[in-house]
């Protein structure tokens, strides 16, 4: 196989895209990073970069036609997916495929596939496209419930509502956190689950492979900590893999899919799926023989996917910092790296207004509990320069 002539265009250039671009660069693949703002993380390591509104069909199609990439790899949901469907019909290779990108760009599309077509078990849910509809569906869902924008990323706009006086605030928060032009929400019955996992599922030319389950903690709908492997009963793991294969087969295409699942005893509830590497999967940068970004690349270009191994129990901690500056400077990295079992990725985002994920701490240990505590101790050293 000759991969030297491959050209990959990444649509969305955040921190996950940056690691994907690095994986491609290491194999000599030409990379193009695209986003709506200058100097996004992946742009800093790509051969070429372009700033466009990816929701604008004309701008998106003109750039793709001009650059003629071998593979078009979406990294975010805020993309004009109708354009991707159109381009795929003209023999452009959308990853994993235009259908998967379109269905997963909003929660309404993927729930329709999961529940109506595949009959997967989920929490009780309903969609609302106005505040009045939202108030109406609450009557059937009941408290407590989870509200999420139909289109958002990194937990933006998500909240758990436990009291009546939180209902209005949660609606407003969801509207502010919505991406693209969609303003609808999904209201889900809150499941008192035992734990939640991400099952990284790799569809490739030789079949489907699974990474070990990744446990994670979220706050305000956003990932804060993850660890691998997450120990779970064989029955629940088998059900999780069955669900993950079913949903990813229905979506189609090659690449890594982040399948989010709730586990309660031996019951497994489908939550969401992303047709790309997952933020909780950043732990694989230290835990696995082949990390999720390398797996995504290999699956896309047709390279072998050998046995995926968890080398050592590991954990990750998101570096979520708060401030108001256009020139962020991070301190404490030296203290965090004093531990030989700790590594760090800084995403090189300069602007921060409020809270923003600026990096990730990675830690390994003899078990996941110690790895998680080690990541938290290292995280405590890191802060913005005052």
Curated annotation (Swiss-Prot):
Transmembrane segments: none
Residue positions binding Mg(2+): 260, 272
Organism: Francisella tularensis subsp. holarctica (strain LVS)
InterPro entries: ATP-grasp, ATP-grasp_carboxylate-amine, ATP_grasp_subdomain_1, PreATP-grasp_dom_sf, PurT, PurT/PurK_preATP-grasp, PurT_C, Rudment_hybrid_motif
GO cellular component, one term: cytosol
Subunit structure: Homodimer.
Residues engaged in binding ATP: 107, 148, 153-158, 188-191, 196
Record bears the keyword ATP-binding: yes
EC number: 6.3.1.21
The entry's keywords: ATP-binding, Ligase, Magnesium, Metal-binding, Nucleotide-binding, Purine biosynthesis
Described function: Involved in the de novo purine biosynthesis. Catalyzes the transfer of formate to 5-phospho-ribosyl-glycinamide (GAR), producing 5-phospho-ribosyl-N-formylglycinamide (FGAR). Formate is provided by PurU via hydrolysis of 10-formyl-tetrahydrofolate.
PANTHER family with a match to the protein in the record: FORMATE-DEPENDENT PHOSPHORIBOSYLGLYCINAMIDE FORMYLTRANSFERASE
Record's protein name: Formate-dependent phosphoribosylglycinamide formyltransferase
